[in-house]
């Protein structure tokens, strides 16, 4: 079977090469095509951080269009440093270098997002249908990335009318419909957008309806049916050099799910579950910014709800979790001879509410955290080949618990990344950060199963993190490559034991290296990534229990995209590989070894010449029907009579038609 897969993949690359040579009677100038020109290798470019140059990940609108991701697993399928667990939408957990995304400062359109509320649910994520760009800044994050950037930052950006409008047009619309096998069912996305007299607007709807999928062995995986109902609305207005943007995002997922969505227990039964998210923000900027006046003012409100109110009469059962997060940011960017300096303040309040339905002796709990911070970050490019990104922030944090006990403290964070460019082809860099995290509450959903005597330890203290990275980048006009060494350490995280909330005594650490390479030849793009990470708690490897820190071992991806302009076609394929994981600590904790797996996805896209505004696409995920579970899923275990992972989908075909007017 391994030989067959290798043969098929090799054939794919060979066919792509042949197609390239046959289809290119006329050479093109790639510099005229923004999506195929590689950026110069440098950590600072035009006063902005180049995330990819320091081992991070950037997905552009063109990248997302190629992938047409139905979920976040497919969104990050070409990134070996990012692992997404399986299951239905609300169960997917995103880990970067083995660390769940709650350990990073996550934002959508600049708005901070809440952390994962419960250890049996997924990460809070944005609908990929709305995205135009994703930046994953792993490790030492900039001071203006936001509060609590322990292991870096993730920035999601959604589309607006100006992104989708054709040149010279003032109105447009887009309709995308698809049908998928293996339970994927129907998916539909509709968008309308326009521009008139300085006012631009967009309204986008996306919904999915399907059934539980089956794994590679043909077993139905309960609680995995697609059930998204999402809305994105945006409006912007420009006048006299001013611009105001207003955005609203609404996300709903209501279906029968497993109680513990990240693991399979004997005798599992589905129960109704609804997960909801609403986000509103308003932002002010200048379109005629000067070197000394380039302001940004933003205010936001987020609400996250989790309803599980029809389960059995146990403390492990019914609960409602509600979170309200609101705050803002005021900053200005100054342009000087060698770069830019951004300075400002940000603030936020996070309210938590839990309802246990009276199945223990403390039904309701209310508690909150507050934060106020000041920050500055400079990004400089010097004539002697050096570039520098450095900054600092100082934050005040306050935590008021469910017993009205109040904790408060303040602390400083610093970061710096220095690079030297020997020539146009080689650059070396090194960076470090020390981050003060304030009071970290983490998976606060634990309190739903705690009684009235549960309290906060008087010594509960803020968390802290350290990051180190170093590497070298190579590149030319049509190729790039790089290696990044990383070491992230996080301490002072919460521990919800049976009696109290306190600090986890362990320091969690992820260290290793990443490799990346990309080559562009005429209409062909080939890329590869490799990640090797060792994730530990204290001196011991972390357990594969779908927690905030997970063992990922060795992971790699290989991908190709091929344009065939003579036939208005695009084809591509992605291979994802994960190595076997076996360690004594996991075995002693009754976990089985995690086998290696190889998964191949592929797609073909065609624009009929007679209907230029229509695109037909067919994609296949898990081409060889591999029976596997993603590296950050709960690994199989002998505990509780036997725990199964949430297996990934088997072979799935998706047929899509898109119209743009």
UniProtKB/Swiss-Prot annotation:
Its main location: membrane. Induction: Induced in absence of iron. GO terms for cellular component: cell outer membrane. InterPro entries: Plug_dom, Plug_dom_sf, TonB-dep_rcpt-like, TonB-dep_rcpt_b-brl, TonB_rcpt_b-brl_sf. Disulfide bonds: none annotated. It is a multi-pass membrane protein. Residues 1-23 form the signal peptide. It holds the Pfam family Plug. GO terms for molecular function: siderophore uptake transmembrane transporter activity. It is found in: Cell outer membrane. Keywords: Cell outer membrane, Membrane, Receptor, Signal, TonB box, Transmembrane, Transmembrane beta strand, Transport. Residues 48-159 form the TBDR plug domain. Residues 170-661 form the TBDR beta-barrel domain. It comes from the Bacteria. PANTHER family: HEME_HEMOPEXIN UTILIZATION PROTEIN C (PTHR30069:SF41), TONB-DEPENDENT OUTER MEMBRANE RECEPTOR (PTHR30069). Heme transporter. Belongs to the TonB-dependent receptor family. This is Heme transporter BhuA. The lineage of its organism: Bacteria, Pseudomonadati, Pseudomonadota, Alphaproteobacteria, Hyphomicrobiales.
